[in-house]
Regions:
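DEDD superfamily 3′-5′ metal-dependent exonuclease/proofreading module
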Residues: 1-19, 24-32, 37-278
């Protein structure tokens, strides 16, 4: 294996590891040819010089990730599932506690003005533009070229790309603060962080975390209560015909929590709409 070491630009939590893998395909049988992860404020990258080294790489990953929170981008669906499968193959018992920033971005996708949720797109959303790098789709071609020519420049390209993926992953720590800022509101000088929003029978239900306890207030528009750092908000709506094709639920503009795409009349907030069946 060829090993690369790069310094991180921020001091990292020693109980957290940022991880990204490169493979020769998307199936569970595809060889893992490269792994990049953080350790002691460094980004460590290993690239296989031959496919038989995969088991050695799995043993390294197991040792480094054990008992740590693993941060990935789409890792819950790919990287970690693949490691589980490889662990069964090589008799390595992978157990993961993970944070997947792709799942966070997907859940709150309406907060991001971006064309898609690819890692590179989200990096640009937060202001990170990569230095010269190959595309992820070129990794397989590079490795095949290495196997044919034994020219290590191809390993270097893969190692750099893998390392930059982890560098970008660290940068995407900003997602947490961004989402918290966008999903928070203040009431009576207390902070409320929205975790769930549901709509049922003309009532909007909002739940989340707060630094307030033993709070209760209600009027004709909404009811809010807080207990043991959890809050529960119910917003009571009115339903009417917006035009001949669209009905809407609305409240008079007093408390603003959620807004529809369609234009609202003055002093009224339309926050849910749907087409009337033709």
């Amino acid at each position: 294996m060829k090993k690369y070491i790069n310094k991180t630009e921020k001091i990292l939590n020693e109980n957290v590891i940022y991880l990204d893998l490169e493979t020769l395909g998307l199936s569970k049988n595809s060889p893992i040819i490269s792994a990049s992860f953080t350790k002691e404020n460094q980004i460590i990258t290993y690239v296989l010089t031959n496919l038989k080294e995969e088991i050695e790489l799995m043993e390294i990953i197991y040792k480094e990730t054990r008992d740590k929170l693993i941060v990935t981008y789409n890792g819950d669906r790919f990287d970690l599932k693949l490691l589980k499968y490889k662990g069964e193959k090589y008799n390595i018992n992978f157990e993961f506690k993970s944070l997947d920033y792709y799942q966070v971005a997907k859940k709150y996708s309406y907060l991001f003005e971006s064309e898609n949720l690819k890692q590179s797109t989200m990096e640009k959303f937060f202001g990170l533009y990569r230095e010269e790098d190959i595309k992820g789709s070129q990794v397989i071609e590079c490795y095949k070229n290495y196997l044919e020519t034994k020219d290590e420049k191809y390993l270097d390209l893969i190692g750099k790309h893998n390392s930059l993926d982890v560098k970008g992953l660290i940068y995407l720590d900003r997602i947490k603060d961004y989402v918290e800022d966008k999903m928070s509101f203040f009431y009576e000088n207390k902070k409320f962080l929205i975790k769930e929003i549901n709509f049922e029978k003309d009532i909007l239900y909002v739940e989340g975390k707060t630094n307030s306890n033993n709070l209760y207030f209600s009027n004709r528009v909404y009811e809010i209560k807080a207990l043991e750092n959890n809050f529960y908000l119910k917003i009571f709506t009115e339903k009417a015909l917006y035009n001949k094709n669209t009905t809407c639920n609305y409240i008079f503009l007093k408390e603003n929590f959620l807004k529809s795409q369609i234009e609202s009349p003055e002093n009224i907030l339309v926050y849910y709409d749907h087409l009337v069946a033709q």
